[in-house]
Structure formats: structure tokens, C-alpha cells
Amino acid sequence: MKYTSYILAFQLCIILGSSSCYSQDTVNKEIEDLKGYFNASNSNVSDGGSLFLDILDKWKEESDKKVIQSQIVSFYFKLFEHLKDNKIIQRSMDTIKGDLFAKFFNSSTNKLQDFLKVSQVQVNDLKIQRKAVSELKKVMNDLLPHSTLRKRKRSQSSIRGRRASK
């Protein structure tokens, strides 16, 4: 995996140590530059509805929204990776990636690396499929709210204890 393009853009965020290394005006300008490059302000872009906004509007609870946002952020990182050789929009993409990194990953390089690692797992590889199925139960248990999991473990322990005493 190539992290160099991400790491270079994000090192400034880490060095500055701020929650956001770019002013919102700078990020907005770079987004407008990308819109211009892709002609994304054209009226036909909205044909068929929004790509992500309607989905985001459905989810109000922060934990639910984070799940959807992680998929959307993954899409943008894949888009920027696909366009990485385009010198015309490189600065805009680097600025936006840096801001996404600061906001979504709280400037944590480890979180970013794990996120990229998970998003780049190949599902058509048999070895990967076998590992994924092997880990499925633990992943499913990790999805449970921790208080429910503890209650279940406690009740299973007390049931086992009663059976042993009979």
C-alpha cells in the first residue's frame, strides 16, 4: 500500500499539532477549485439526486452517522488515490485530504493507516475470505454494545455455576 501521498499531506497537520491545520476558507477554496476542474457546478450534476447528502440526512445519532461517514470518507480517499497523478488538482486534493485527516481521524496517523488497511482489503482473495470468516464471530461480538455483552457473559457464568452445583 502506498501511504506516501497521504503521509506527506498529513505531516503538516501533525507538526502543527492543531485539530485542523487548514483554515476553512482555504479548504472551501480548494473544494471550489475541484468543482471547477470537474465542472461540478453544472446543473446536470444534480440529476438523479444527491450521492451522499440524502443518506447523511437520514442518520441523526452520532454513532450511526460515523458508520456512514466512514464509508463516504473511504470513497473520497479512493477518489483522490485514483486522481493522484493529476498535477492540476494535486494541491487541492492534498489540502482536502489533510483536512479530512484532521477532522475524521483526529490527526491520528495510526487511525488513518488502519482505516486505509481495512478499506483496501481485497474481497476476491480466497485466503482473505477464509481469514474474514474465521474472525467473523469476534467481529460480530465487537459490534454488540459492551454493556449487553457483559450482561450476557454474567448470565452465562451464573447458569454454568448453577449447572455445576447440581
Curated annotation (Swiss-Prot):
Homodimer. It comes from Marmota monax (Woodchuck). Belongs to the type II (or gamma) interferon family. This is Interferon gamma. One of its GO terms (molecular function) is type II interferon receptor binding. Keywords: Antiviral defense, Cytokine, Glycoprotein, Growth regulation, Pyrrolidone carboxylic acid, Secreted, Signal. The keyword Transferase does not apply. Gene3D superfamilies: 1.20.1250.10. GO terms for biological process: adaptive immune response; defense response to virus; humoral immune response; positive regulation of autophagy. GO terms for cellular component: extracellular space. The lineage of its organism: Eukaryota, Metazoa, Chordata, Craniata, Vertebrata. Disulfide bonds: none annotated. It is found in: Secreted. InterPro entries: 4_helix_cytokine-like_core, Interferon_gamma. Released primarily from activated T lymphocytes. The gene is IFNG. Residues 1-23 form the signal peptide. Produced by lymphocytes activated by specific antigens or mitogens. IFN-gamma, in addition to having antiviral activity, has important immunoregulatory functions. It is a potent activator of macrophages, it has antiproliferative effects on transformed cells and it can potentiate the antiviral and antitumor effects of the type I interferons. Pfam families: IFN-gamma. Glycans are attached at N39, N44, N106.
